[in-house]
Amino acid sequence: MLPLRIVCPLAMLMILTSGASGQEVDDASFRNLAKQCQMRASVAASSRAIKIKDEAIAQHQAFNGSRVDRTGRIVFFGHSEAESDQELDGNVSARQIPWRQALGYWEKLNDRKIGEGAGGALQVWYYPGALDDDPPSILHRKKMQVQRLLKFISGLDLSQMGPESDDLREALQQSVIRSSISDVAWSAAFVSSIMRAVPLDEKTEFSYDASHVTYITSAIEQSLRDLVGGESTSFYRACDPDTTKPRIGDLFCYHRHIEGTPHPYAQKGPSLFKSLFRDIAKGEEPISHSHCDIVVRVDSDSSKVTVIGGNVQNSVTEKVLNLNERGLLSAAQGNTVCDSYNTDKPTSPGEPNCNLNRQKWFVLLQAAI
């Protein structure tokens, strides 16, 4: 569909309710959206938003996750995704095994167990020739679906191994799953698993997916409907973090297409929120690498907001972000000596990647009331 200028609410409503895309958003519409977002921000969080907060905190505690302070540095190194248990005697519950916890997020995302096909997005990455005595100078990465590997292992005839056959099969299956947890990003699976616990309806309220961009796009579509008084179906709308105060249950999101990465995002205009909002509203796909954290605490007195996200430094991590004097997300995050940490950006000697809080925060997903 060709780009469309908003000319009247009725025409816009017809476009939005039909699920079409390709519309442009003018500055007046952004001002209207800002007012709606600010109005909702002044209302206390709903019971479901509180449940989202409680579940995120519970998962952080269960994972024994990491913590990042307001300077953007890790102050507590929690368990990592591929770790085994930390008990000396090796007798633990499944909740004490970090990689099993991370697998649980995938199972909740897909609403079924790994044995029932929950690992559709999980892959094992491998490099043919990497174990050769004289490996090639350049190794090419290949991927294998976890479900295919698990099916193969299940079909192996291990009867010749005697009483060890069951243990051998279990060890092979767990090794495959454990390596896939390290190979495939699970931050969006973590967020989706939190929403399952509420639960949010997957047909209307939340787009469960292994990619953050999917539910960010759904929130933008809801904001467009809100502009014309359309139906409020999605639990989240997209708001500008520069003009909207956070509440518990909201999500702060950033993108990782920055200068120095293979695919930087070329911002159009002074506002990152408006630039990406417009691009996505027009049906474009300007970003693919993004991350969202769940707001679990807002402390106006100390001008701090605490968020929790999955797969942050390979853990479930709690971060403390700065708010400005107006209670909005501050442009000043962490230690200015450090460049923002970005896995897609190579480290330079002059700018060590050591600040986990200084990111391209571009949207606040605001929870419904």
Whereabouts are the PLM-identified features?
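Positively charged n-region of N-terminal signal peptides that target proteins for export
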Residues: 1-5
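Core nucleotidyl-transferase/polymerase catalytic module
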Residues: 179-188, 200-202, 206-208, 222-237, ...
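Bacterial N-terminal signal peptides
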Residues: 7-17
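Boundary at the C-terminal end of the N-terminal hydrophobic targeting segment
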Residues: 20-24
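N-terminal capping segments
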Residues: 25-204, 368
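Short, solvent-exposed loop/turn and secondary-structure capping segments
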Residues: 67-69, 205-207, 263-267, 318-321
